[in-house]
Amino acid sequence: MTLNYSGDPRAAAAEAADLERAGIDVGWVAELYSFDAVSILGYLAAKTETMELGSSILPIYSRTPTLTAMTAAGLDAVSEGRFILGIGASGPQVIEGWHGVPYDRPIGRQRELIDICRKVWRREVVTHDGPSYHLPLPADQGTGLGKPLKLINHPKRADIPVYIASLGPKNVEVTAEIANGWIPVFFHPDKADSVWGDPIAAGLAKRDASLPPMEVVAGGALSICDEATAARIRDLGRFMTALYVGGMGA
């Protein structure tokens, strides 16, 4: 169940508690150019007891990899091991327009970020030298005083699940290779295999055997109503399409 991210967080928390009592097993919070998802997820962790809580999604450009790892570990701790880190590249309209940073190397950045996060959760002394991220920062790019560090706290879990929101063939292939789960959008079950079957198969062929089977979280809309209301409810789907095409697309 995707929880309301554009309204009152307290109302969303009350709704989440009601949904939990009704049997919903996972609640997702989005982050666009809205309230940040982390504050809401932390509040939800205090107001729920059993349902999993996931970010859907935290953009990879809005936080450093280590901050993303720290945030996920903190949310997993306060929720007693119920957090799912959902990440994604978002799009240039939001990343460059709202966050003011270049939208470059989205798939490569995503892979590096996950690698760094998993090092942090294992409490390794974190070093990384990639195309996008360098830990510690090289001396010629800063003061030269940076040192390799490890997380002070002991995480609730060293294997916090990471889900990726992806659509393009290469991104879906990487998702199937390295992520715990996949968050597609506008998912049509009858057409999924013809669109994504090959990249999923290619990614799974390279998947580390230590990873669990990839979960798929495909959103959908459900409304219980009479026929008179059905047409109006169907029209509400136009809003989400317009948001993705006009408000976030490029």
What feature does the model see in each segment?
Residues 1-250:
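Active-site-adjacent structural elements that line small-molecule/cofactor binding pockets in enzymes
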